[in-house]
A protein has these predicted regions:
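A positional/architectural concept
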Residues: 39-43
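Exposed, interaction-prone extracellular/peripheral surfaces
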Residues: 1-38, 51-56, 65, 70, ...
């Protein structure tokens, strides 16, 4: 059973609190301009303090607090337009592959992104999906919501469903419409029309991020000789002799598939990143997501 704390310690969570999800679509009104965090808004509703870090706007330093405590603090204000972040977690059976499993890494990443969003006063919704959206946790707000959000993620990781159909992300429109950020976590190992699924999220006002999660054994299979391979989602099997030539053809096919996703996302204005299950989620992955324009 997946630990609903995902093994994160307080030092790592403190690092996450210095990040925000990057919304590439400018907000309208007083919060207009590229958004780093909705609590850096221009409304007059006071929200909280936090410690000053290099690069913060000196105009929001609370000098009274500095005079009392000899430390720099920023006054934070609740933005007038709160961003809704929906994390779509693929919990199909193909995500059970790998050591650690792809589903476990996707769950930890969902926990990381949800924590960052909730810390920044965003609203977070969780959509579990396989053949379609089979579980939906409506928008949760504030850090008090972290345990509930993480429990939902852990339950999805522990309860796989038979198939992946990215095209059925179009059913999200039944749950909500309007501006927001949609983060799709999947291996994208599907014959379904993933293009129409991602486009459908854009059509209902979402700024879309797609993160493909693959196991090293999928990228470079350590197989030779005679095997019976079974499709994780359809249970269809095939007996094959795995030769260097066949492995070469497989790698070429996977590269074409990943290239198609990458180029599609670039054309559609969708942020895209590929992560391996052996990634250091407590370290380099945060830098990778910043480089991909997903975190700021």
């Amino acid at each position: 059973m997946t630990d609903a704390t995902f093994g994160f310690d307080s030092a790592f969570l403190h690092r996450l609190e210095r990040l925000s999800l990057l919304n590439r679509r400018p907000l309208q009104g007083p919060s207009a301009g590229p958004r780093r965090s909705p609590r850096h808004g221009a409304s007059v509703e006071f929200a909280d303090f936090r410690t000053y870090v290099t690069g913060d706007d000196f105009r929001r330093v609370d000098w009274n607090a500095y005079a009392r405590l000899d430390r720099l603090f920023l006054r934070l204000y609740r933005a007038e337009e709160i961003t809704v972040v929906t994390i779509f977690l693929d919990h199909s059976t193909s995500m059970q592959f790998g050591d650690p499993k792809k589903s476990f890494i996707a769950g930890k990443l969902a926990a990381i992104l949800s924590y960052i969003a909730l810390h920044n006063y965003d609203t977070v919704a969780i959509a579990g999906w396989g053949d379609g959206i089979d579980r939906f946790l409506p928008g949760q707000s504030g850090k008090k919501a972290v345990p509930r959000v993480w429990r939902t993620i852990a339950q999805l990781v522990d309860n796989p469903v038979p198939a992946t159909n990215v095209a059925n992300l179009k059913t999200y429109g039944k749950y909500r419409r309007g501006p927001g950020i949609a983060v799709v976590l999947s291996d994208f190992m599907t014959d379904s029309d993933w293009r129409s699924g991602l486009r459908s999220l854009r059509a209902v006002g979402q700024e879309v991020t797609a993160i493909q999660i693959l196991a090293p054994e999928e990228i470079d299979p350590p197989l030779r000789g005679d095997w019976k391979l079974v499709d994780a989602e359809t249970s269809a099997g095939a007996e094959v002799t795995i030769s260097p030539r066949l492995l070469h053809r497989y790698r070429e096919a996977l590269e074409r598939h990943t290239k198609a996703i990458t180029e599609f996302c670039r054309r559609e204005g969708i942020a895209f990143a590929q992560l391996r299950t052996d990634v250091d989620l407590n370290g380099t992955v945060l830098s990778d997501l910043r480089a991909a324009g997903i975190l700021a």
